[in-house]
Amino acid sequence: MNGPTCLYDAKPEDLLPAIAARIQQDFQNLPINPATLTAQPSPNTLRGAETNIFADAHVQEFDVTILGQRVHLAATPIEYTYNYGDGTTLGPTPAAGGPLPKDRWGEKTRTSHVYQSTGDFAVSIMTSFRGTYAVNGGPNLPIPGTGQFPSPAQTLQVWRSITRNYADDCTVNPAGEGCPGWTDPGT
């Protein structure tokens, strides 16, 4: 025998079915970052007003070894389930929502919520990711099902506002009730 010699098993093991059989469990165990939850306004909002709540999630990629093979996985956010903390939920929905400029806070959005009572509410989001994988640089294959990844809850304080009308003219009577120079006799 002269030259290089290749040694291989006459019946090499096909690892793709074995990788496919365990890929969904491995996908669930990846360190996928859940969506970041943001509320506007925050950490306080008003009862009866629209509170814009939105998710920020991105595609995440991982290179792992499964059964001795190089596997590239990608996790893509596809749906969100919003838990507003007052017994109300939205979703699953593909709507991630998004930030509003401060001068538009209070506007209704696809993911906003109106709180009907005051108090502290634990707001959270469950993000569903769809995955694909490629073995040893091969084609991307879908991972069956989705992975569910919860965001840590954030406490949102819902306050009430009181509006009062005053008849005093603060330029004439700077110490009048409701004027900057007024002091509450009860304090």
List where the protein language model places each region.
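Extracellular/lumenal mature domains of secreted and surface-exposed proteins
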Residues: 1-187
